[in-house]
């Protein structure tokens, strides 16, 4: 595990200087439709920023001291192996507990990813698909999300999952955070714990995945409950640091 220690800023401003052309075109179309009074459905185009203003501004009057340990790699935390995927939050929590660890809290993941510099991406302020496993072509799944273990027992589910899979081996790309934690952006979306929430909504997803998603340090997806098992979903574990 990696020791993460420092001062975390709870509220920040990260100003995007340049978005993808796809996102800009989508926003223009939506603005035109809105001006005509047309109803707008949720956009299917992710807000991907190519370049952020440097430095990030901390809005909090006081930073929060943090000290904890986090796995260097996505579960099973072994360099050179592809991370597990199609996992539910409950499965992730149980596996971390089985090795004397726990799921990372939202702010722990964020700080381990961005560091005290509050980087939008683990590696800096400009999006770079050569650093992390991101921006691969999106492939539409044909069936409802199925947990990995159950999917492996169904030949058609297994075949589809293999066709969707675009993971890379842990540590195979130079996708390191300021603390040396690997693959915190992209590869697989990672389950985290949301303190103060009640089941089945203690679950959050952070870091993004291999597809055309935000794949940044700060955002947290809260739309999926604890039994969701998206094909792009994995996790890593945290633990309290010894005094």
What are these regions (language model features)?
Residues 1-97, 117-118, 124-127, 132-133, ...:
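Short, compositionally biased
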Residues 59-61, 159, 227:
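Short secondary-structure boundary/capping segments
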Residues 80, 84, 173, 225:
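Conserved aromatic-histidine-acidic binding/catalytic patches
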Residues 89-221:
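Functional-site microenvironments in short loops/helix caps that host divalent-cation chemistry
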Residues 223-229:
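Short proline/glycine-enriched turn/loop segments at secondary-structure junctions
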